[in-house]
Amino acid sequence: MKPALLPWALLLLATALGPGPGPTADAQESCSMRCGALDGPCSCHPTCSGLGTCCLDFRDFCLEILPYSGSMMGGKDFVVRHFKMSSPTDASVICRFKDSIQTLGHVDSSGQVHCVSPLLYESGRIPFTVSLDNGHSFPRAGTWLAVHPNKVSMMEKSELVNETRWQYYGTANTSGNLSLTWHVKSLPTQTITIELWGYEETGMPYSQEWTAKWSYLYPLATHIPNSGSFTFTPKPAPPSYQRWRVGALRIIDSKNYAGQKDVQALWTNDHALAWHLSDDFREDPVAWARTQCQAWEELEDQLPNFLEELPDCPCTLTQARADSGRFFTDYGCDMEQGSVCTYHPGAVHCVRSVQASLRYGSGQQCCYTADGTQLLTADSSGGSTPDRGHDWGAPPFRTPPRVPSMSHWLYDVLSFYYCCLWAPDCPRYMQRRPSNDCRNYRPPRLASAFGDPHFVTFDGTNFTFNGRGEYVLLEAALTDLRVQARAQPGTMSNGTETRGTGLTAVAVQEGNSDVVEVRLANRTGGLEVLLNQEVLSFTEQSWMDLKGMFLSVAAGDRVSIMLASGAGLEVSVQGPFLSVSVLLPEKFLTHTHGLLGTLNNDPTDDFTLHSGRVLPPGTSPQELFLFGANWTVHNASSLLTYDSWFLVHNFLYQPKHDPTFEPLFPSETTLNPSLAQEAAKLCGDDHFCNFDVAATGSLSTGTATRVAHQLHQRRMQSLQPVVSCGWLAPPPNGQKEGNRYLAGSTIYFHCDNGYSLAGAETSTCQADGTWSSPTPKCQPGRSYAVLLGIIFGGLAVVAAVALVYVLLRRRKGNTHVWGAQP
């Protein structure tokens, strides 16, 4: 059932069942093989819990699990909650993921059902079903969250002690023992086996035969005590295993046979397998790596150019952090985590393009220095490098180069080891992974809604609309993007409702993507996130790969939604209401409608009604109230959730815009003198803040509105366009000073010894995006500066000698005079 039809289905369901609990389950009134269904005499949809309309066996068949997430590498044991077997010994549990991947489960002594997650080649929400009759039927269903290996907590995996040492083993001054550690409680068994698994992608690149595969290679240790640590001296692997250059270690219970798939396990991070490479590598690692670098270079030259379809990097660090719809922090170089930028020395922060490129599944990376300057590979080996395989993978995943982490390792990271870390051939790598210099970057456009509520449109118009109901913030037919919001009255300190309202829920969908809703949680006042009307938990993971979007939650009070089109939403709690910011790339120009205005660089038509009629600038607050009411949501197209009888009766059954609600208009605001004085001190000239203090009688609400408004203004400042002149090369046989290429920046040129500068010594980036002077040339011969130095140096020596001579003559004369005195 499409989410847009959910309100109608709920309406029918609520009418049939009333506000009480559902009937007793029988063969027709069961959730067996019906999870998510609304039809029938009782509901198996997630909203049924709040409405009291669930079938009585809802929890038995629509499964909740703990934990709900784990590494896509598999091996995580999880428990089915709210369901126990009465006779555990009779059960034969099989867990089936994505309709085809089966793992053996079990029932513990307390009757709880367990499953083990399988090795997957994708991240995101994975549907699974459970059979208790040895695979004859799978009536129970749930969802498992497969996570990128680097986002898994250290409690859930084994750690390579000094991981750099593992990946440099066999190179100069790196030998001896290697160690790994793990948490014993994470794998409850007496003895363990440690295995090496290798990853490869075979077949013609970008063909149907191109496949990804993890393979069991050989054991490092068998039947050893589960002590939490292991140390060994690596030996070169037999020739038959040498083709695997990247892989991971797996720790399993020794009762399992070698290489047994999909059993409870702890994995290490994937890493370069330097420690298992052949004697040829250990005897001359530089020569060996140089050969591999050249082979990679030859392969790259045969593959299609993926750089052309990548998004352009933001020009500054502030732009990169503000453009949250298209770029997100690279966990390998994060200034919020101490800027440990192993692969990008000189950078303090990197971002990656959120969405992989459509055709090749590639990814952009952009890195910045402490002063916010973009760091380019043309200037530094620490510069940002684009990726043939996006580190986070790309839907539909599973096949190269779209496998999360692993495709990136093969085509972008392992080659970096060959060319840059194990051999001094980094220019070869950088030539094929050049940084984007941001000349064509265009910042997104920003609109916001916050406070009581106040709106700032994409073209900069601001207004206040105090409607009670559900409204269209944004519609864009270009990508079928829809953003809707629910507004409800606030509460005064005496418990009465205010005549102002605020946003309490925001929902978004683009095309046939998932529907995500962010709303105020009734009990905590924090945020609650719903996916297709089901409340999500973020106790284990703060990042989720969803259909058509990515979702990130920060500290429980800010949610970022990144859509496939590059559009982005940020929803946060500010005081008693939600604050929402919407970012749209330039391609949405002339394609938007709704309360956030018509994006076309013309603020005079932002008050456009559904009919196309435009209210002129200077429209009265009363007329603007009618404009807002014109953009009400319809039941048939609502994205919002109605999972309580309060919501059903007040928003599903009632008109989407409450015509009985009397809003507060600016001309009607009055404050007692003492509160007015405090408001003036708090708000200054922020009229949004002043209005909200008057509307709610609360200084804290005014403060929240002022903060939200300031955040909008700061982000607007961060997203201001800047002019880039592009990278400027140093002269051959010379150097340049400066690596900033934005308007107003100056580059200085110098020649090597034995060369003279022909051309300007400096070049400045001009406002039109051109350099004031081209790169000069360094010609053979002494430079003019050196010649002038010699000339002036010689003159200085002559002058100094003359001065000494004069002083000595004077001293000699004085001595003669003094000697004649008594």
Curated annotation (Swiss-Prot):
The identity of this protein, by name, is: Sushi domain-containing protein 2
Any Pfam family matching the protein = AMOP
Topology, Cytoplasmic side: 807-822
Stated membrane topology is: Single-pass type I membrane protein
Question: Which gene is this protein's source?
Answer: SUSD2
* Residue ranges that the Swiss-Prot or TrEMBL entry lists as coiled coil: none
- Cystines in this chain: 31-35, 31-44, 35-62, 42-44, 42-55, 48-54, 55-62, 725-765, 751-778
Query: Function, please?
Result: May be a cytokine receptor for GPR15LG. May be a tumor suppressor; together with GPR15LG has a growth inhibitory effect on colon cancer cells which includes G1 cell cycle arrest. May play a role in breast tumorigenesis.
Report the transmembrane regions from the record. Answer: 786-806
Organism placement in taxonomy: Eukaryota, Metazoa, Chordata, Craniata, Vertebrata
Record GO biological process: negative regulation of cell cycle G1/S phase transition; negative regulation of cell division
* Domain called Sushi: residue spans: 723-780
Subcellular location per UniProt equals: Cell membrane
Q: Which organism is it from?
A: Homo sapiens (Human)
**The entry's keywords:** Cell membrane, Disulfide bond, Glycoprotein, Membrane, Receptor, Signal, Sushi, Transmembrane, Transmembrane helix, Tumor suppressor
In this protein, which residues make up the domain named SMB?
28-66
Primary localisation category:
membrane
Q: Where does the UniProt entry place glycosylation sites?
A: 162, 177, 522
Cellular compartments per GO CC? extracellular exosome; extracellular space; plasma membrane
Signal sequence interval, chain numbering? 1-27
